[in-house]
């Protein structure tokens, strides 16, 4: 995961305005909206979130909310990216402190990658509604949602690839496909009660161990 994701959007009145086209005040109001949604997702499932309540909590007028996000799905997608950014900034801050302290990560590629995915799974364990939202957004055909999720995926992949020193590009690509696919399936089974959290972690770790066996 990497901080500072900029969500690109298509031009048009039925899609959210690009962050890069916003004034400082507009970016602040947009952040207030996504912050409110993130807080609400810790309390309720995505389908229970109402735009009016988001407006009330964020103290952003309902009309302004709809100018920024024409649909609830767009708002949820932007909030998912914002939540991911929070995790990314925290991770990068920890890595920065370790570098400044001269700490050397002597773990194998496999162990580093497994640790990163365990960390992501713990974030979903603390906020299972984010896992539910992730699955909903992954199934969406909306162009803005798909583009937002692609930005998020690319950022997360960049963070994972940074841990794969010495791994050939073709091997790394297949590893990401395999681990991400297992992660998505594990989240679907876990949130539906068909798999325990421990089972979800084990599935992801096992696949990571298999595809990165030569880098243990």
Predicted regions and their residues:
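Hydrophobic alpha-helical connector segments
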Residues: 92-126, 201
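Hydrophobic alpha-helical segments that form the core
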Residues: 4-8, 170-192, 200-211
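Generic hydrophobic, amphipathic alpha-helix propensity
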Residues: 26-37, 54, 79-87
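Amphipathic alpha-helical interaction segments
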Residues: 32, 111-119, 133, 174-182, ...
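N-terminal intrinsically disordered/low-complexity leader segments
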Residues: 1-28, 39, 95-99, 216
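Amphipathic alpha-helical packing segments from all-alpha helical-bundle domains
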Residues: 88-92, 141-177, 202-205, 209
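Helix-turn-helix
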Residues: 32, 40-74, 78
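Short secondary-structure transition hinges
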Residues: 121-158, 189-191
């Amino acid at each position: 995961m990497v901080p500072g994701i900029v969500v690109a959007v298509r031009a048009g009145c039925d899609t959210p305005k690009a962050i890069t086209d916003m004034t400082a005040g507009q970016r602040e109001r947009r952040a207030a909206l996504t912050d409110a949604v993130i807080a609400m997702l810790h309390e309720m499932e995505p389908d229970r979130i109402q735009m009016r309540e988001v407006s009330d909590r964020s103290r952003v007028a309902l009309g302004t909310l709809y100018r920024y996000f024409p649909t609830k799905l767009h708002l949820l997608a932007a909030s998912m990216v914002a939540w991911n950014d929070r995790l990314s900034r925290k991770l990068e801050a920890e890595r920065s402190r370790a570098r400044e302290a001269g700490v050397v990560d002597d773990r194998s590629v496999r162990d580093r990658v497994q640790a990163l995915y365990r960390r992501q799974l713990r974030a979903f364990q603390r906020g299972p509604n984010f896992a539910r939202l992730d699955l909903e957004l992954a199934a969406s055909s909306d162009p803005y949602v798909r583009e937002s999720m692609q930005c998020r995926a690319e950022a997360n992949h960049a963070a994972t690839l940074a841990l794969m020193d010495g791994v050939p590009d073709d091997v790394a690509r297949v590893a990401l496909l395999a681990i991400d696919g297992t992660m998505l399936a594990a989240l679907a089974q876990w949130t539906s009660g068909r798999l325990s959290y421990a089972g979800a972690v084990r599935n992801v770790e096992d696949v990571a161990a298999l595809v990165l066996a030569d880098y243990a």
